[in-house]
A protein has these predicted regions:
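Active-/binding-site microenvironments in catalytic and ligand-binding cores
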Residues: 19-315
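Bacterial N-terminal signal peptides
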Residues: 5-15
């Protein structure tokens, strides 16, 4: 039976290669160790130096804070079986003369992968291997992963750049399965008169966020976003973060039906670049804001794969 399964897997692999699979994850010898050393767990977060923070601070000129996080609630779109339920409770009314009462809430949710979210490196693998070739099987416990937990990331402050691809294409929302090209990115940046720099947080406006809590079924079924070529081009600019106003940052489903969410592997596994998903970018786009100081901090979930976040753009 085992030999039969292996034979079938080999046939499947050969069929994929003969069909011209558009992207294949590089071998461990090609991608490891990472540029920051064999034991590194921070990846692109290493780009947040004091100089990078000071450079971001210089972009704050009018003191305006723009929220980039969606509201967490039961009516937001969910991928798969994820959920977010809030149950409020009256906990007590004390017996002191001022009769102070208290209320709390119980949240039932997958806190790392709902709403506006930050993808840590433990979130995605190539087979059994994470970023920097740490192994899932060697670092998995019931209460969290012992390597690459999102608690390692800390606060990130850097120059944020909005690439308004929807605006460049002259539409409110890109098509349901539109793959953003390198030419789209270059054209939008030229129109906005912006040049990408190492350490940037690159946020891509597709307009897909307009469907949030309005057409959830369509929102999660597919989405426009970057593909393999655009992702590799962006990562070549040495960003700290890649983000978008859709659920996976990338186009989904991928036009190549043989592969699933390859940009997740390209960013998180191969290159150690964190992703920001489900961002609220409509206000930035409407105001024509291309550069700003981005501030984001994942929750310190020990051994977690990611975190819901509420990033802000300050200008």
């Amino acid at each position: 039976m085992r030999l039969t399964i292996l034979f079938l897997l080999s046939l499947l692999s050969a069929a994929r290669l003969s069909a011209g699979q558009s992207w294949t994850p590089p071998s461990e010898s090609q991608r490891c160790p990472s540029r920051w050393g064999a034991g590194d767990e921070r990846g692109s977060a290493n780009l947040m130096t004091r100089d990078q923070v000071l450079k971001a601070a210089k972009l704050i000129r009018v003191g305006e804070v723009i929220e980039l996080g969606q509201v967490l609630g039961a009516n937001m779109p969910f991928f798969g079986t994820r959920r977010f339920d809030v149950h409020v409770k009256r906990t007590f009314m004390n017996d002191f003369s001022n009769r102070r009462g208290s209320n709390e809430e119980l949240v039932v949710s997958e806190i790392g992968q709902v709403g506006t979210q930050f993808d840590g490196f433990a979130h995605q693998t190539h087979e059994n291997s994470w970023y920097n070739c740490f192994k899932v099987a060697e670092n998995a416990t019931r209460s969290g992963f012992t390597k690459l937990g999102v608690h390692n990331v800390g606060a990130l402050i850097t120059r944020g750049v909005l690439i308004d691809v929807a605006g460049f294409k002259g539409v409110e929302t890109l098509g349901d399965n539109y793959e953003i090209t390198v030419e789209d990115l270059e054209g939008a940046l030229k129109k906005q008169n912006v040049t990408l720099q190492p350490g940037d947080a690159i946020l891509i406006n597709t307009g897909w966020g307009k469907l949030w809590a309005k057409d959830n079924a369509r929102y999660v079924k597919s989405c426009p976003g970057i593909g393999v070529k655009a992702a590799e081009w962006l990562i070549g600019k040495d960003p700290m973060l890649l983000g978008s106003d859709n659920w996976p940052v990338e186009v989904a489903p991928n036009p190549d039906k043989l592969i699933s969410l390859p940009v997740h592997q390209i960013a998180l596994v191969v290159n150690g670049v964190h992703l920001l998903e489900n961002l609220k970018l409509d206000e930035l786009a409407a105001k024509g804001v291309s550069e700003f100081a981005l501030i984001v901090q994942p929750l310190k979930i020990e051994g977690g794969t990611g975190s819901t976040v509420a990033p802000v753009a300050v200008r």
